């Protein structure tokens, strides 16, 4: 990378990243460097949601490189997704008017329930399109969409529920990172992902109480809708990456949720 020659920083690619994230070292200083991240990162840093932003530079080839404070620590375990701190942090993000204004300012996109269905059907393989359980789920979601309660307002949603995106530092600071999927959406969009992907680890009622959710009938309907929708999207992703064992397990879980609904 030309940036090393231009600045004297030594870059070490990080595992799990596709040439986008590095540990940068220069004169015993260590930073987390990432190419072409969202301009929204500055607001996240100011709000203490992501590690402190140190600087932003443009490289000679036109890439934007951001540098953040290097945090020694670890990502959360799956079982830790049930922590009160996770739910409370997510609520703080959803409730932040500052983040909402900043995301709008940098051109953040609005993502609605119908966009989820469009995303699912785009490029959907025939094996999934005609699978009886998945077909039943899509018919149910389409039917419910017509009368799905509309949220009073959209908020900043992270858009990628994963324990690997939660960083717990050695100083016990909790950060939510990797904001490439951020959108303005129904808070149930984020929450439905967590309830779908971590249904075995999260006690739903306890977690929703920690989030301080207003558990109206309308909100529960939206949560249930997004939980089914996110399950379908995850099944599609598992199929596309040939993770068939995981896909089959998710289909079994999806079928249980459908039976609870109908």
Where are the regions a protein language model picked out?
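Helix-rich C-terminal or lid/interface subdomains of diverse kinases
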Residues: 196-198, 210-262
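Active-site Asp-x-Gly
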Residues: 169-220
């Amino acid at each position: 990378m030309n940036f090393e020659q231009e600045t004297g920083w030594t870059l070490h690619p990080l595992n799990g990243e596709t040439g986008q994230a590095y540990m940068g070292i220069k004169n015993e200083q260590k930073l987390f460097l990432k190419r072409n991240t969202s301009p929204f990162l500055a607001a996240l840093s100011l709000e203490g949601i992501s590690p402190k932003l140190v600087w932003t530079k443009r490289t000679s080839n036109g890439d934007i490189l951001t540098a953040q404070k290097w945090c020694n620590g670890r990502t959360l375990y799956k079982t830790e997704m049930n922590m009160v701190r996770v739910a409370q942090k997510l609520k703080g993000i959803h409730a932040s008017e500052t983040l909402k204004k900043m995301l709008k300012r940098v051109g953040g996109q609005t993502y609605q329930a119908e966009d989820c269905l469009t995303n699912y059907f785009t490029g959907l393989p025939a094996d999934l399109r005609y699978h009886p359980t998945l077909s039943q789920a899509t018919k149910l979601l389409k039917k419910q969409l017509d009368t799905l309660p509309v949220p009073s307002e959209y908020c900043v949603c992270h858009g990628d529920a994963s324990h690997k995106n939660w960083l717990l530092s050695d100083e016990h600071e909790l950060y939510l990172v990797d904001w490439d999927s951020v959108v303005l959406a129904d808070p149930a969009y984020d929450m439905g992902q967590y309830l779908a992907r971590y249904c075995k680890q999260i006690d739903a009622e306890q977690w929703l109480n920690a989030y301080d959710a207003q558990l109206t009938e309308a909100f529960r309907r939206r949560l249930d809708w997004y939980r089914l929708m996110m399950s379908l999207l995850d099944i599609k992703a598992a199929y596309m990456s040939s993770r068939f064992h995981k896909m089959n397990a998710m289909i079994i879980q999806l079928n249980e949720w459908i039976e609870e609904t109908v």
